[in-house]
């Protein structure tokens, strides 16, 4: 029987690692190749170092803009589809961060994730972040 919860658990792990700043753990839960689509330029990151490259670019942009303390909270999944060794998860999300010390909340974001089951573990193969409103 296919488990609908295992891919969602992997998505939550990835976000938990992001929230604690554990980039190596974020990368370890990803498939190779990995793809990221985000609102931050250059908007697309691909390959075995996609997560590390994306995180570095987020931190550089944050430093330039005075943004710190990023934290993502995921809601209940809107969509979970598991077919064999592939899964697709769509989750509403809220991101909080500080800009020059002022708290900002970005609500209504959508985190869409494609996963592959490799060696009995769900790995994130791609994700896209659709920005909400601040």
What residues fall within each predicted segment?
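Short, cysteine-centered beta-strand-loop-beta hairpins and adjacent loop/turn segments enriched
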Residues: 96-105
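A solvent-exposed, acidic/Ser-Thr-rich amphipathic alpha-helical stretch
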Residues: 23-85
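Short, low-complexity N-terminal intrinsically disordered segments enriched in polar/charged residues
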Residues: 1-33, 123
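Short beta-strand edge/turn micro-motifs at domain boundaries
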Residues: 88, 107-134
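Beta-strand residues in well-ordered beta-sheet regions across diverse protein folds
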Residues: 37, 90-92, 125
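Hydrophobic/aromatic beta-strand elements that line small-molecule binding cavities or substrate pockets
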Residues: 74-80, 93-95, 110-116, 129
């Amino acid at each position: 029987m296919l488990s609908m919860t295992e891919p969602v658990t992997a998505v939550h792990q990835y976000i938990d690692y992001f929230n604690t700043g554990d980039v190596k753990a974020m990368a370890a839960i990803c498939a190779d190749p990995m793809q990221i689509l985000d609102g931050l330029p250059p908007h697309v990151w691909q390959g075995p170092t996609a997560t590390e490259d994306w995180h570095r670019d987020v931190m550089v942009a944050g430093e330039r803009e005075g943004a710190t303390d990023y934290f993502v909270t995921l809601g209940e999944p809107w969509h979970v589809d598991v077919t064999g060794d592939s899964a697709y998860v769509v989750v509403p999300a809220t991101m909080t961060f500080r800009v020059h010390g002022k708290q900002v909340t970005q609500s209504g974001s959508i985190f869409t994730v494609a996963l592959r089951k490799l060696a009995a573990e769900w790995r994130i193969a791609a994700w896209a972040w659709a920005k909400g409103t601040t």
